[in-house]
């Protein structure tokens, strides 16, 4: 989940609402679910086992720049663990993310060959240079509320 400053406001509220729904689904289906938040640095939260850390996450605003490098490294590390080796990945972001080094993007292809599906949920209408690296990116458009 992209927690950079560009996600502040309506995108942040939308992302948090979706995250709450994903938590509910994981509980109902008794599925593992792991959250990796990122802006410049990353935080990892096992959302079914570490509720305190999850509540702490919801109490902090989204801030900072965006760098997906460490998030991707954390994702690949998790996918290499037995517990998550059959997992799929969902990246929630406005996709105002600078591209990573080609070797990291190549690792996405390696994991895709192992059966991992990479999905995205783009909040907003920013140009998206990541589309070719995902199996599918869903898009939610929104309008900025005007203040008078």
Report each predicted region and the residues it spans.
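Von Willebrand factor
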Residues: 1-47, 53-92, 96-99, 121-129
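Active-site-adjacent loop/helix micro-motif of nuclease/hydrolase catalytic cores
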Residues: 10-14, 68-70, 99-105
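Short, surface-exposed linear patches
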Residues: 20-23, 29-30, 56-59, 111-115, ...
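A generic secondary-structure signal
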Residues: 21-25, 74-81, 110
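Short, surface-exposed, polar/charged, turn-prone segments marking secondary-structure boundaries
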Residues: 26-29, 61-66, 116-120, 145-148
